[in-house]
Amino acid sequence: MGHLLMLWVAAGMCYPALGASAWSVNNFLITRPKAYLTYTASVALGAQIGIEECKFQFAWERWNCPEHAFQFSTHNRLRAATRETSFIHAIRSAAIMYAVTKNCSMGDLENCGCDESQNGKTGGHGWIWGGCSDNVEFGEKISRLFVDSLEKGKDARALVNLHNNRAGRLAVRASTKRTCKCHGISGSCSIQTCWLQLADFRQMGNYLKAKYDRALKIEMDKRQLRAGNRAEGRWALTEAFLPSTEAELIFLEGSPDYCNRNASLSIQGTEGRECLQNARSASRREQRSCGRLCTECGLQVEERRAEAVSSCDCNFQWCCTVKCGQCRRVVSRYYCTRPVGSARPRGRGKDSAW
């Protein structure tokens, strides 16, 4: 594989040990032709990118995107269509599409390359299509084949999962931007050559996190949920899917209480979690994480002071090294702890992922 994959291999991420992503890829290989082996490394990379981005986006939330959640999202016994599951399906589908598209454009995969279908055509006043456009069509095709094939159900939950898979792929399409290069005498830029390029995946993660924050709950009664693949079950859900919602994340069921430990749902609770307080570079939401993770879950915020060592007083020495000293300083870190003698923390119950 090429540069994109090598970056992750250099970071110590070996594909046979990718955990949740490898689990999903293995599920796919059971039912797919051996020809698709060509793309499994790129798909596994994409799945891992999705996991890491999910962890980043939810690092300071009560539900912090544990890696096992990516396994549970395809496990028949644990197929709850919650707000969190909607994000998992979307980010995984988007990340796989992203990784395959980038590897394709770099020439790392067989049977695909840059999208040159528009090259030479006039795109607008003063510019023409050219260069190497990212092949999002191919990336979307492979993502759909891999991810959607994991959904074996035919009930309302399955349709919701497939909808969110597609919303993730639409997020990748929404991130494409036109990049141009000037041509002309003495840099006059009399004409430009332009191509389509995917944005950094962090932008897609931010986009999908915003979709998660305002995800739409589809109201269905228990009779409709049990309808399975009967006509009334499919029709009831189809009626809810208006064209305007195709890029939105949707869910059916409220979230469990993420404040408290629940072994049956593999929820660890927030006790022992670190939170941010007085951090200058933190966002407003991150600044409020101690209240969200600790106080609102019936826990207290405990300050722990520790010595941190960092490089400082660096000087360039001829030739050609940089020598640094070591500086020590005391830093404060904050954790959610249970008050002495208190009972189990009490959270807000349903929809308490915030």
Swiss-Prot record:
| A Pfam family per the record | wnt
Q: Which cysteines are joined by disulfide bonds?
A: 54-65, 104-112, 114-132, 180-194, 182-189, 259-297, 275-290, 294-336, 312-327, 314-324, 319-320
- In the UniProt record, the gene name given for this protein reads Wnt8a
Query: What residues show lipidation of type O-palmitoleoyl serine?
Result: 186
**Compartments, record wording:** Secreted, Extracellular space, Extracellular matrix; Secreted
Alphabetized, the UniProt keywords read: Developmental protein, Disulfide bond, Extracellular matrix, Glycoprotein, Lipoprotein, Secreted, Signal, Wnt signaling pathway
User: Which residues are tagged as glycosylated in the record?
Assistant: 103, 262
Which named protein is this?
Protein Wnt-8a
Q: How does it assemble?
A: Forms a soluble 1:1 complex with AFM; this prevents oligomerization and is required for prolonged biological activity. The complex with AFM may represent the physiological form in body fluids.
Question: Alphabetically, which GO biological process terms does the record hold?
Answer: cell morphogenesis; endoderm development; establishment of animal organ orientation; polarity specification of anterior/posterior axis; polarity specification of proximal/distal axis; regionalization; regulation of protein localization; Wnt signaling pathway
Query: What PROSITE patterns does the record point to?
Result: WNT1 (PS00246)
Q: Briefly state the protein's biological role.
A: Ligand for members of the frizzled family of seven transmembrane receptors. Plays a role in embryonic patterning.
Q: What is its main location?
A: secreted
- PTM annotation, UniProt: Palmitoleoylation is required for efficient binding to frizzled receptors. Depalmitoleoylation leads to Wnt signaling pathway inhibition. Proteolytic processing by TIKI1 and TIKI2 promotes oxidation and formation of large disulfide-bond oligomers, leading to inactivation of WNT8A.
Q: Name one GO cellular component term.
A: extracellular region
Question: What family classification does the UniProt entry report for this protein?
Answer: Belongs to the Wnt family.
Supply the InterPro entries for this chain: Wnt, Wnt8, Wnt_C, Wnt_CS
Signal peptide as annotated in the record: 1-19
Q: What induces it?
A: By retinoic acid.
Q: What PANTHER family does its record include?
A: PROTEIN WNT-8A, WNT RELATED
